[in-house]
Amino acid sequence: MKKLWIVGLILVFVWAACGKKAEEKAEEAAPVLPGVTAGMMSTLTQFGSALDKKDFAAAYSSLRAVLQDFWGLSPLLLQNVRFVKNENNTFGIYEPRETEEYAPGDAIYLYMEPVGYASKKSESGKYEIGFSADMSIENDKGEVLGGQKDFAKMAFSSWNFGTEMCLTFTYTVSGLEKGRYKIVTTVRDAGSDKTATCEKWFSII
């Protein structure tokens, strides 16, 4: 009887040790991606599974879902800020201006691509997006020469959760002497409390 008890104790010990090793292996196998939420990780797993099955439509949908989650986490960002030749632009389709020099009275067109804005679904089923903006002009000493709050307000709607959005602001300034100046533009997201500011230098010749 004593011998059986010893064998039983050894079996229990081995079983417990195996269980512990299995738990350690499970912990080691768990992917570690700092900042990635559980929901995003689940969707990324779905993406990988769909890709492995060559179900590219499902994989694309999963990627879009991750991007939508990222959009909610991200602050408002202003990407690809540049001077362009006119105000008629769409996302990624514009004519870059080769120079940042302007004659007095020239219209200045500034293109940018916002990221992380709110996109809220309305009762109609459309996603509603909106922005407002303030602007100011500074000289090379940092002195504010003028500006305007809410100089632009824009609203958009789409049947899809849109992530390819561009804004083009038109600035008409007068009374500036020859020299170097800075346009400071603050964009506010209408659907949240997110804001972002960009600065762009130009010269009057």
Q: Where do the language-model regions lie?
A:
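Intrinsically disordered, low-complexity terminal regions enriched in Ser/Thr/Pro/Gly
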Residues: 29-205
